Amino acid sequence: MSGGVDSSVALVLLKDKYEVSGYTLKLHDSRGTDDSGLCGSASDIEDAKAIAAKFGVPHYLLDMRDLFSDTVQKSFVQSYLSGRTPNPCVECNETIKFGALLDAVKKQGINHIATGHYVRSCYDEKSGRWLLKKAINADGTSNAKDQSYVLYRLSQQQLAASVFPLGEMTKDEIRHIAADSGLINSDKPDSQDICFVPDGDYAGFIERYTGNTYPDGDFLDENGNVIGRHKGVIFYTIGQRRGIGTGFGKPMYVIGKNADNNTVTLGSNELLFTDTLYADNLNWIAFEYPESEFKCKAKTRYRQTEQPCTVYPQGRNTVRVVFDEKIRAVTPGQHVVFLSLIHISEPTRH
């Protein structure tokens, strides 16, 4: 229970069918000010406690601040410092919410966890595997809140132990149930951006986490010529336009970063498009691994529309992905997720 409306409604939907307990994760230290923008904030914890109490459900608070800092936040910082652009929500789901939390509740005799994610899962008798499926609306149309992208790293064991009661519901339906149930958070805003960087200042978080500041360096053009100065590699990501300046005679975008040399390469928007990427650290869901090339759709960002592509296995842990049409701003450190009409399978962006 995050204290948000989605996990609260998941509780409402399940409490009369199962013996339910509520678990909330403490992931951050209070800053002594309003921390309502943080996932697992003091206000969120109080909301979760109140909702569990309303329905007579046992509530437990698990302190995972050290683990969260040493895994999710540390990996986020290291990725940025190496010039990559990570998605910490993916690692948090795999390592914390469906990892450490699941391990903790199993020790208390609980075999399944339910969350407020907008996603579906099912067991496929033919393959003998659990499948991860996109959220849909009641009429079968695509659900704009689908979160399958950030859950693609879940293992077969994690999927088998997970329940997703909101997989065929809209946000409006969720809020309606919450209001009818008298939940105090029925109109609570959705969380935005990375939960531990609610202000979107990634560079500021990295400086606070490491205790270091990071030097400015050279802007390069596509041919390696110095064309200006940047304020630090950690302030930029592939495809970025904002904050670069306008003194180059034409619109310029970040097309590359080199953390070792402390340089940021700029170029025109056209240079951001490619039809090929390579991915490793694979996590296949619908099968153990592909025997041969296959066609599907893929996305490299959470809010991106899936694009048709062909996936070419190169060994058991690397693939080459060729898109039917070029896509914009393929970024090292991001994740690529493969989808078909039947299932979702996936590797991590290399």
Where are these regions (language model features)?
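ATP-dependent adenylation/nucleotidyltransferase module used to activate substrates
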Residues: 1-153, 163, 172-173, 179, ...
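Short, glycine- and charge-enriched coil/turn segments that flank and shape catalytic ligand pockets
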Residues: 34-36, 108, 122-131, 209-214, ...
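Short, glycine-/aromatic-enriched active-site segment of Class I SAM-dependent methyltransferases
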Residues: 160
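Anionic-ligand-binding alpha/beta catalytic cores of soluble enzymes and soluble regulatory domains
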Residues: 177-283
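Basic, glycine-rich polyanion-binding accessory segments appended to enzymes
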Residues: 250, 258-340
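Conserved small/polar residues in nucleotide/adenosyl-binding loops
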Residues: 342-349
